[in-house]
Amino acid sequence: MYIIIGLGNPTREYEATRHNIGFDAITRLADDNNISLDTKKHKAICGKGMIGGEKVILAKPQTYMNLSGESVRELIDFYKVTKEEIIVIYDDISLDVGQLRIRTKGSAGGHNGIKNIIAHLGSDEFCRIKIGVGDKPKNWDLADYVLARFPKEEEPAIREALEKVSKACETILRDGAKVAMNLFNKKEINT
């Protein structure tokens, strides 16, 4: 069994913001795989199903971003999975809008949700899929930027990224993270 966790903030005011792209990815995975996100437990909204021939739990922690580790820890403990059996999906301002980066370990890179998960797990060795949301303009505050919605011109890149995340998760579950990294960690070149 695997647990796939998308990071974001609960409540309507944060829907469709850059920081909630992890929640959007979980919604896309649920839709693509006929999984109902209809259970509230372990400080998360969850759904059970199958992806890539593996049993999965999809989860959207409801603790607010900076406390995501509380929910992740509860999920891991309850379902008795190892840190190698989780995938965390979240926003990354260091990547171009829509670019994916899959990693199996690494620092939080300034992301407070990941920092909290690392603290609760006592390890940075877990699979994560970063979705590029672009760097903030010089005159923007970081919090205002990540809590802003995507402008219309970026929406096609985000839709495409969510489609790729769905395929990347299936690849990780079926073939492993290394194969997925080779397939999806490519920067698109516009010619």
Curated annotation (Swiss-Prot):
Record PROSITE patterns: PEPT_TRNA_HYDROL_2
Name assigned to this protein: Peptidyl-tRNA hydrolase
Lineage of the organism: Bacteria, Bacillati, Bacillota, Clostridia, Lachnospirales
GO molecular function, one term: tRNA binding
Originating gene: pth
Entry's EC annotation: 3.1.1.29
HAMAP family reported for this sequence: Pept_tRNA_hydro_bact
Domain of life: Bacteria
Reaction(s) the record says it catalyses: an N-acyl-L-alpha-aminoacyl-tRNA + H2O = an N-acyl-L-amino acid + a tRNA + H(+)
Catalytic machinery residues: H19 (proton acceptor)
Keywords: Cytoplasm, Hydrolase, RNA-binding, tRNA-binding
InterPro entries found in the cross-reference section: Pept_tRNA_hydro (IPR001328), Pept_tRNA_hydro_CS (IPR018171), Pept_tRNA_hydro_sf (IPR036416)
Primary role: Hydrolyzes ribosome-free peptidyl-tRNAs (with 1 or more amino acids incorporated), which drop off the ribosome during protein synthesis, or as a result of ribosome stalling. Catalyzes the release of premature peptidyl moieties from peptidyl-tRNA molecules trapped in stalled 50S ribosomal subunits, and thus maintains levels of free tRNAs and 50S ribosomes.
GO CC annotation: cytoplasm
Site (Discriminates between blocked and unblocked aminoacyl-tRNA): N9
Protein location: Cytoplasm
Site (Stabilizes the basic form of H active site to accept a proton): D91
Pfam families linked to this entry: Pept_tRNA_hydro (PF01195)
Record carries keyword Cytoplasm: yes
